[in-house]
UniProtKB/Swiss-Prot annotation:
Transmembrane segments: none annotated. Its EC number is 5.1.3.6. This is UDP-glucuronate 4-epimerase. The lineage of its organism: Bacteria, Pseudomonadati, Thermodesulfobacteriota, Thermodesulfobacteria, Thermodesulfobacteriales. It comes from Thermodesulfobacterium geofontis (strain OPF15). Pfam families: GDP_Man_Dehyd.
Length: 323
């Protein structure tokens, strides 16, 4: 039985994709460099959840290390690669763009080269809705996205282009999935919902960039994991949006729902809107429905309820994590 190689397996999406594959009886080979882009405490928590399965193997490897990655391909039979390892975050990419180029472009190139050399034909490549900055929503996959507003978006676009080249030259079957604002239990502590929940519990001001009317197409983690795994089917080369697909919800509305679920009022601190951010994200998911028979099942109300319930069950973990 071949392994499904999941890069960035200790990350939010990597962890949940790994869990879903393991529940399906698949063997999962996970790699992650466990970098400190955000508090690693949560990465270790996710890894410990995955290690409960005998079908899970983990290696602490940086995908920019070609030789270390090559050893994985030499040692294991790999059925497909789900490439989720990346430096993420719009604002952070302005502070250290070099690490974004290394991880998101060089790391992706290393995987593509090894897939070519070892005859691994299927890649699911994680991309981002940040690529659509400056376009009019709802965003569909055919929009021209050649004007990224951040190094993060630029490097993810670069990874998409590299993957197309390897599809064209070497026949790799590649599904590029563009994620829209993923949230849920054990989510990234550098993302809004985790921070909002933590700050409400701790009665600290919630920092909001802009007036809070900016809106996001929030997508629950389980829906994202399902869509990612569905993208393993043979498609040739396709770019597919995975998002909520309905009217986006504002940051102010998210805070109001969290206040109700937690039972505490938030303190709000409004800051200047960041010029690398976008005002609205909104996915056209008609392509995902057609090609993957996929659409989100979890509403924003239900998803936030599950997220808050998880936070209550893991309150000491939440409090220990630095944001």
């Amino acid at each position: 039985m071949g392994y499904y190689l999941v890069t960035g397996v200790a990350g939010f999406i990597g962890w949940r994709v790994g869990e879903f594959l393991l529940k399906e009886g698949k063997a999962v080979l996970g790699v992650d460099n466990l970098n400190d882009a955000y508090d690693v405490t949560l990465k270790y928590w996710r890894l410990n959840e995955l290690k409960k399965s005998e079908n899970f193997k983990f290696y602490q490897i940086d995908i920019t290390n070609f030789q270390a990655l090559k050893t994985i391909f030499e040692t294991y039979s790999i059925s497909a690669v789900i490439h989720l390892a990346a430096r993420a975050g719009v604002r952070a990419s302005l502070e250290n763009p070099w690490v974004y180029v290394d991880s998101n472009i060089t790391g992706t190139l290393n995987l593509l080269e090894l897939m070519k050399d070892f005859g691994v034909k299927k890649l699911v490549l994680a991309s981002t809705s940040s690529i659509y900055a400056g376009q009019s929503p709802p965003f569909h996959e055919d929009l021209k996205v050649d004007t990224p507003l951040s190094p993060y978006a630029a490097t993810k676009k670069g990874a998409e282009l590299l993957s197309y080249t390897y599809h064209h030259l070497y026949g790799l079957d590649i599904s590029v999935v563009r994620y829209f604002t993923v949230y849920g239990p054990a989510g990234r502590p550098d993302m809004s919902i985790f921070r909002f929940i933590k700050w409400i519990y701790e009665e600290k001001p919630i920092k909001i960039f802009g007036d809070g009317t900016q809106a996001r197409d929030f997508t629950y983690i389980d829906d994202i994991a399902r869509g990612t795994i569905a993208s393993l089917k043979p498609l040739g080369y396709e770019i597919i949006n995975l998002g909520g697909g309905k009217n986006p919800i504002s940051i102010n509305q998210i805070i109001e729902i969290l206040e109700r679920l937690i039972g505490k009022k938030a303190k709000r601190e409004y800051l200047n809107f960041h010029k690398a951010d976008v005002k609205v994200t909104w996915a056209d998911i008609s392509k995902a429905k057609k090609l993957l028979n996929w659409e989100p099942e979890i509403s924003i109300e239900e998803g936030l309820k599950r997220t808050v319930n998880w936070s209550k069950e893991n309150i000491e973990l939440i409090k220990s994590i630095k944001v």
